[in-house]
Amino acid sequence: MENIAPALLDWFYTNRRILPFREDPTPYHVWLSEIMLQQTRVSAALPYYERFLAALPDIPALAGCEEEKLHKLWEGLGYYSRVRNLQKAAKIVCAQYGGQLPADYNALLALPGIGEYTAGAIASISFGLPVPAVDGNVLRVFARLYNDPRLVTDPQVKREFTARVMEHQPPAKAGDYNQALMELGALVCLPNGAPLCEQCPLGTLCRARAAGTALSLPQKTPPKARRITPVTVALVLNEGRVLLQQRPAKGLLAGLWQPVLWEDTTLTAAETAARLAALGLDCTGAHFTPLPAAKHIFTYIEWHQSGYFLTVPEQPAPAGCVWAGKEQLEAAYTLPGAFKVYKKLLLTKLL
């Protein structure tokens, strides 16, 4: 196949989006942006990116940030293991590399939370190294370009696709080439619908377009079925404060704060009262008002939430819990997006 780089780069320089991490592509900026964009759309991530950089402008600041502040800066993005790994890696970079990311692909790959794609993006965009950065967008472009029906999730197939990507990469413009492929996949060679083939700079070379098979590519492993998990939530209020409990240090939503809840069960009001009493909470005279149902989807788990709202007498928080007022809820304690329906309700109650 004819080398795609000239046409691709011409298109990219004319059509690329103006993004802050492209305008100032320092290693830290590229790293942060790539981690944020792993599970988040560009438009949704940009406000978080700007806010995060304003608070933590460099790697030493990230390394030294308090956990609650770090979680608060990430609140709303989800997948909190991303930001925990960011900080773990930042601490290693400060200890081993003087607070600057190393200009070495393998050294980047050894850092927590940095996989092959992210290491390639940092190395090529920020350091100009001729290495691949192959994400889902790039795999989709090349599956269609070569009309290749194999599973792109197969490790051997991905290695072969990566080799193809490198066959076309101009070493002196590795970063621009990698970004151009990502941009083409994001703006033109679209997933989940008809690609905009008439706008594609590679349209005359694309074998799937010629064969009429673009919509069926790339082939992927069918998604794993999510496990439905019932969750009972108790929004316990007292004197303008809500009772929060901290999740375990490991596992789903590790270390974050949440309303009192019980997973894998749907409890009646009486059963909820008994569970709260077992925590050491005095619910004397409390009226249990049903909460609206809420649903939240994790990667492989789907929470179906229900529960109760109640007000209890003034008392100390049980072990592992805190009482939090409206200001604390907004500024200090990070409630994951799984509870956004109930957080909105809480903020109307906590006057």
Please identify what each model-predicted range represents:
Residues 1-18, 23, 186-351:
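Intrinsically disordered, low-complexity, charged terminal extensions of DNA damage-control enzymes
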